[in-house]
A protein has these predicted regions:
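Structural core segment of the AMP-binding/adenylate-forming
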Residues: 4-65, 72, 378, 387, ...
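Conserved AMP-binding A3 loop
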Residues: 85-111
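ANL superfamily adenylate-forming
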Residues: 40-81, 190-219
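Conserved AMP-binding/adenylation subdomain of ANL enzymes
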Residues: 108-125, 132-218, 227, 252
């Protein structure tokens, strides 16, 4: 509600620590804060004292003001397309928080991109399960449905299994956008045990396009309310085994690729041109190409250009300069290859790459995908230690017996 009137929105994740909240409020020089009573304790007294206004986001009651007679005088400032709309703080993969500055043009162009890539209508029902502080959720699950006139249902708290199942049954959504973790948990918790109990396990592994696979896929669709026509997955790489099942079960999924810095969508894969492990092609109005390509492996860094690319990092011109090429392309730090059809396959993050003893490039993400697919593993991280690769594994609590 504030952005159309020239104000700047700075969302903060609800699970942020007191220090993280303090750092964001101080770095952004915020003057007004909307906060629930439940999370008010995360705003330090020092921060509250610097605020012009503190408002209860649930009741819109003024909790604190530097003027007891404070009133809204209705003054507005109509923004231009290149004015700042929002600053999204993200730690990314390098640790230190970055304030990603996105303009009205950045967000609006990505909404139009979504419409050209996947048309939704006022008849669609969206179920929102991700934090609104993510650009994926803000652009694709709030602004885009508004543009389409669709209805969005929001969960009151993080989507634990029981809450999500109840919401799916009630809403019967036609559209959802999630991170891979949600569909991977459903696959490991419901689909995989069904496959493993089947006497046709060996046959199915070799022929996952068989009748049994289709039947399980229909049951999976029913789990999501029975009306799903578009299930978007983004934010991280999807487990290849899970994607292979979704593809052969004819589940209506699509893979999206992007970053906070690009508002976020850059590429997508859906319908008949989906293939396991690829995010497909650039979306409408966006250009992608590989930079500094290794002639032996074909690997290069994905760089992007389009109206959705951020203005820069807030108060950090040096970091901003470092992520753009001399001719203005944004450097994603994602290393990828392209196949003969031009589809992109991400290998890993440039900053995460480990140089092997024979000079080969090792991407921890590829090893982690294999480990995470093992029975009893919840998640893992692979690092280099004294010249050797070491995997830290978190067991699945439902599987491991202590």
């Amino acid at each position: 509600s504030i952005v159309p009137f020239g104000r700047i929105a700075i969302p903060i994740l609800p699970d942020s620590s007191v220090n993280e909240v303090t750092n964001i409020l101080e770095h952004s020089e915020s003057k007004v804060i909307f906060v629930s009573q439940k999370l008010a304790s995360k705003v330090s007294k020092e921060c509250r004292d610097r605020m012009t206004l503190v408002i209860d986001i649930d009741t819109f009651e003024v909790l604190q003001s530097d003027d007891e007679k404070f009133t809204c005088d209705g003054r507005t400032s109509i923004p231009t397309p290149d004015d700042i709309a929002t600053i999204i703080y993200t730690s990314g993969t390098t640790g230190s928080a970055k304030g990603v500055v996105l303009s009205h043009r950045n967000l609006a162009s990505n909404v139009i991109t979504c419409y050209h890539s996947c048309k939704r209508t006022e008849k669609d029902r969206w179920l929102s399960v991700l934090p609104m502080a993510h650009t994926l959720e803000m652009t694709l699950c709030m602004l885009y449905p508004m543009y389409c006139g669709a209805t969005v249902y929001y969960l009151p708290k993080p989507p634990v299994a029981s809450l999500l199942m109840k919401a799916l049954k009630m809403v019967k959504p036609t559209t959802m956008l999630t991170v891979p973790l949600i569909i991977e948990k459903v696959y490991k918790g419901s689909v995989l045990p069904t496959i493993q109990k089947s006497r046709t396990l060996t046959w199915m592994n070799k022929n996952m396009n068989g009748l049994m696979c289709r039947i399980i896929g229909m049951k999976l669709k029913a789990t999501f309310g029975g009306h799903m026509s578009f299930y978007g997955i983004g934010g991280a790489k999807l487990d290849p085994e899970v994607e292979s099942f979704l593809l052969k079960a004819k589940f209506p999924y699509a893979i999206g690729y992007g970053l906070t810095e690009t508002s976020p969508l850059l590429g997508y894969s859906m319908h008949n041109w989906r293939t396991v492990g690829s995010f497909g092609y650039p979306v409408y109005n966006v250009k992608l190409k590989l930079h500094n390509v290794n002639p032996e492996t074909g690997e290069g860094e994905i760089i992007a250009k389009g109206p959705n690319v951020m203005l820069g990092y807030y108060k950090d011109p040096a970091r901003t300069k470092s992520v753009f090429t001399e001719d203005g392309w944004f450097r994603t730090s994602d290393i990828a290859v392209q196949d003969e059809k031009g589809r992109y396959f991400i290998k890993g993050r440039n900053n995460n790459m480990i140089l092997g003893p024979s000079g080969e490039n090792i991407y921890p993400e590829e090893i982690e995908n294999v480990i995470n697919n093992l029975e009893g593993v919840s998640e893992s991280i692979v690092v280099e230690r004294e010249g050797k690769l070491v995997a830290h594994v978190q067991p699945n609590e439902n599987f491991v017996q202590w």
